[in-house]
């Protein structure tokens, strides 16, 4: 078992098994539901444990090949956690609002990212100081607005290799765009959500802060382990290339 894998106990302690009220359920989630308690659906964690660990192993493999996973969680319960864990793992993220076309219209979005980077340079190289107060204020506001929307993807450099999504219904547009482009989706899917178009369905509570923290931190750990492996392989290869050179000398 890898260090980043999650156990049944971890999920229980985080409340990952508590679904939504039974009247809000999506019948497509039937196979993942254990039963109901006080009109709340209980998620069968016997499904969640292997599903989550499969997804973590997939993300680990991607990271070991230096690929990128885009973290997506824009609702209040997820945004801070998604941002923190994506930053810790050195991955792109969307924590504020998904802009339509963020993936499918990447070329146009890149122009906005370039504008953001240009404004950030201007704010640091003294350009803003040469402007009138009004012009400087307008550019500062534009920069802050762009940073809020695009700050998490400004260094992505191109389309991601996978999406990791908290609350697949809330992020339906992101998932649809990923599906159109053939980008795999890892999704936390609650009892009220539609699992269609999600490649790695992880049945679990998508509202509890502790549960969301568990998923996102485990994902970050898996990615960091993959990156560490890639670095160790690169170091070993570099040493192997140095050895013949040293013997020739």
From Swiss-Prot:
<dbReference type="InterPro" id="IPR005706">
    <property type="entry name" value="Ribosomal_uS2_bac/mit/plastid"/>
</dbReference>
<dbReference type="GO" id="GO:0003735">
    <property type="term" value="F:structural constituent of ribosome"/>
</dbReference>
<keyword id="KW-0689">Ribosomal protein</keyword>
<dbReference type="InterPro" id="IPR023591">
    <property type="entry name" value="Ribosomal_uS2_flav_dom_sf"/>
</dbReference>
<dbReference type="InterPro" id="IPR018130">
    <property type="entry name" value="Ribosomal_uS2_CS"/>
</dbReference>
<dbReference type="Pfam" id="PF00318">
    <property type="entry name" value="Ribosomal_S2"/>
</dbReference>
<dbReference type="GO" id="GO:0006412">
    <property type="term" value="P:translation"/>
</dbReference>
<comment type="similarity">
    <text>Belongs to the universal ribosomal protein uS2 family.</text>
</comment>
<dbReference type="GO" id="GO:0022627">
    <property type="term" value="C:cytosolic small ribosomal subunit"/>
</dbReference>
<keyword id="KW-0687">Ribonucleoprotein</keyword>
<dbReference type="InterPro" id="IPR001865">
    <property type="entry name" value="Ribosomal_uS2"/>
</dbReference>
<protein>
    <recommendedName>
        <fullName>Small ribosomal subunit protein uS2</fullName>
    </recommendedName>
</protein>
